[in-house]
Every structure is written in structure tokens, then in C-alpha cells.
Amino acid sequence: MKAEQQQQSIAPGSATFPSQMPRPPPVTEQAITTEAELLAKNQITPNDVLALPGITQGFLCSPSANVYNIEFTKFQIRDLDTEHVLFEIAKPENETEENLQAQAESARYVRYRFAPNFLKLKTVGATVEFKVGDVPITHFRMIERHFFKDRLLKCFDFEFGFCMPNSRNNCEHIYEFPQLSQQLMDDMINNPNETRSDSFYFVENKLVMHNKADYSYDA
């Protein structure tokens, strides 16, 4: 009975692709130096991003770093307790090359909006569908770090497994959300878009993609 009530009360989320990122939260001089040092490196590794003290101010690699032509085509979030789909988005088929390049740039920064009770969910399944280019991928890894202002909420670390060349792949990652205090949830609801995430994608321990998102919980 409780699961049925929860399923009915959680409205589907939404996503937009703003042309500009909001001004990042204040950071220490050390954080700026750390990010600058990473940008000066020839190769950024998982250990590098895990050592960052906060959300990044910008992107740590350009779209051209994606030499494997990894393209995410579908994304869905569902509540595993109720099987209720909370959010779903898919790229249209048969896009022109010019449109694909523009989408690759705009999709690097997404703004999500969910209902307040999204913060009370315990376990969520995130299904992604993606394509790869002519080169097989043997070690594809994602590290996703979520912050509220300057506080680290959770760090997720997922492996995608082997991907054949010119293949379309899909997998579901399980997100176990941290238990948040009522005061923290209220702060996150009352400060839309101050909850942010960095999603870092690595192939053979080298950063090839970096996406950013912010979140509001006032839908």
C-alpha cells in the first residue's frame, strides 16, 4: 500500500539544456589550482578526478576527446521499489551530422527538475543506451560525483564492460541514494540548481568525456 502511494505521488521529472552554465559555487584557491593542474595534463585519470575537492568550474576535456565516438541515445530513470518511470529522454533518429555535433556540445550540460519527494527515494535504476564507433572499447568506466553547494553527497563508480565496434549497447546502473536529513532536503529544495554533478567517462583510464548537470526539486 505504501509503495502504491509513493508511485502515485512522484511526478515525472524533466530536463532542459541551458546554453550557459550558472556561476559555480565559491571554491578555495586550492580547488582552482587543482583543476588548473588537471587541465594542463596530457591525460586525466580516475584518481585525478576523485581527488578533486569540489564540483568543477568547467569541463576537463573537449568534445574532441571522445575519439571513440561514444554517443548516448537514451536515458531512463525508474524507482526500483515501484517500477515507476521517473524520467526518460531519447535522441531522435536520422539526425544530420551538423545537428549531431551541436547536440554533442549542448548535451554536456543538463538541468533536471524533479518533485520534492524524489529526495526520499532509496534505490533508482538508471538505464542508458549508447553507440560506439569503429574501435572496440575494453575498459569503459564512469565516475559521477554529486554535490550540494560544497558538500559531497555521493560518488558513484560504474563499469560499462566490453563494447564491440559499431555497436548499440544498453545497461542499467543501480543508484543507492544516501539517507538525507530533513534539514538537508529542505535546503536542497529551497536552493534549486545548487545540487550539481560531474560525470566523468574514461576509456583505458583516460578521460574521454565530461558532462555536467544541476538539479532542482521543486516541480
Curated annotation (Swiss-Prot):
Keywords: Cilium biogenesis/degradation, Developmental protein, Lipid-binding, Protein transport, Transport
Record region (Disordered): 1-27
Tissue-by-tissue expression: Predominantly neuron-specific.
KO phenotype (gene knockout): Worms exhibit diverse nervous system defects including defects in feeding behavior and chemosensation. Phenotypes are due to defects in protein trafficking, such as mislocalization of odr-3 and gpa-13 proteins in olfactory neurons.
GO annotation, biological process: body morphogenesis; chemosensory behavior; cilium assembly; dauer larval development; feeding behavior; lipoprotein transport; locomotion; negative regulation of axon extension
GO cellular component: axon; cilium
Binding-site residues, tetradecanoate: Y112
Biased composition (Polar residues): 1-19
Sections of the chain in a coiled coil: none
MF terms in GO: lipid binding
Free-text comment about domains: Adopts an immunoglobulin-like beta-sandwich fold forming a hydrophobic cavity that capture N-terminally myristoylated target peptides. Phe residues within the hydrophobic beta sandwich are required for myristate binding.
Chain's role: Myristoyl-binding protein that acts as a cargo adapter: specifically binds the myristoyl moiety of a subset of N-terminally myristoylated proteins and is required for their localization. Plays a key role in ciliary membrane localization of proteins. Required for the establishment or function of the nervous system.
Stored PANTHER family: PROTEIN UNC-119 HOMOLOG, RETINAL PROTEIN 4
Family: Belongs to the PDE6D/unc-119 family.
Protein name listed in UniProt: Protein unc-119
Organism, as annotated: Caenorhabditis elegans
Lineage of source species: Eukaryota, Metazoa, Ecdysozoa, Nematoda, Chromadorea
